[in-house]
């Protein structure tokens, strides 16, 4: 009798896991058809049910969905149309987090190559967020973006050892550190002015400004 009950329990559990995995596959199809809201509903259920077996796939698809959303905003900019900078930033951060979670579950490294390529490209977009937010005087958001760019190798394991990430040829790390210090000061988040101070002081063009920011921060705290 106990063996029979156990068999039924295992059957029910496996059926539930299979159903949740089907939700993820269905969500993939919906994303391809640009039915984003419907896809998100299915993914939310799959990610929170506790029954989904292939969590790496679920988080990979979730990352793809967020990528679709922030890419839509970039396409607007390319077409010289107004873009929602807050929506762009929100979905970029969410996409990065989703791919990182995928990597944590991806024991067989099925998605590593794909997501590594994405992460290599997406770092630049953090600079867009920083620029958008600074121009809109959202200094907290600007600091977050610059800090995320600077700490990218530490926070994204798939690209942590990539030479192009460790030594970015597009943006000067010391210049980005200066932007971070400036955003923190403008946002009156004085403790964060010192976070990237050492690197910012190496940006010779604005080293004097950085020292002044540091001094004013000490006086205003």
PLM feature spans:
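Short coil/linker segments at helix-helix boundaries
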Residues: 65-180, 191
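Bacterial Sec-dependent N-terminal signal peptides
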Residues: 1-29
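Short coil turns that delineate tetratricopeptide repeat
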Residues: 51-53, 107, 154, 205
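Conserved structural position within tetratricopeptide repeats
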Residues: 45-48, 104, 151, 198-202
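TPR repeat positional signature
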Residues: 23, 59, 66, 126, ...
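Start-of-domain marker
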Residues: 20-78, 83-87
């Amino acid at each position: 009798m106990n063996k029979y009950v156990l068999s039924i329990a295992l059957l029910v559990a496996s059926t539930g896991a299979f159903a949740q995995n089907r939700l993820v596959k269905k969500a993939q199809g919906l994303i391809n058809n640009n039915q984003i809201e419907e896809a998100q509903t299915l993914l939310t259920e799959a990610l929170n049910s506790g029954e989904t077996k292939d969590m790496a796939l679920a988080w990979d698809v979730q990352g793809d969905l967020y990528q679709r959303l922030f890419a839509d905003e970039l396409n607007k900019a390319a077409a010289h149309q107004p873009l929602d900078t807050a929506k762009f930033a929100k979905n970029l951060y969410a996409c990065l987090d989703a791919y990182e979670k995928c990597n944590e579950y991806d024991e067989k490294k099925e998605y590593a190559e794909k997501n590594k390529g994405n992460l290599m490209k997406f770092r630049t977009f953090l600079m867009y967020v920083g620029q958008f937010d600074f121009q809109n005087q959202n200094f907290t958001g600007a600091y977050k973006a610059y800090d995320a760019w600077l700490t990218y190798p530490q926070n994204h394991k798939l690209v942590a050892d990539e030479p192009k990430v460790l030594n970015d040829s597009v943006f000067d790390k010391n210049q980005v550190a200066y932007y971070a210090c400036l955003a923190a000061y403008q946002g009156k988040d004085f403790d964060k002015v010192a976070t990237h101070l050492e690197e910012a002081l190496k940006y010779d063009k604005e080293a004097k400004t950085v020292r002044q920011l540091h001094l004013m921060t000490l006086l205003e705290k």
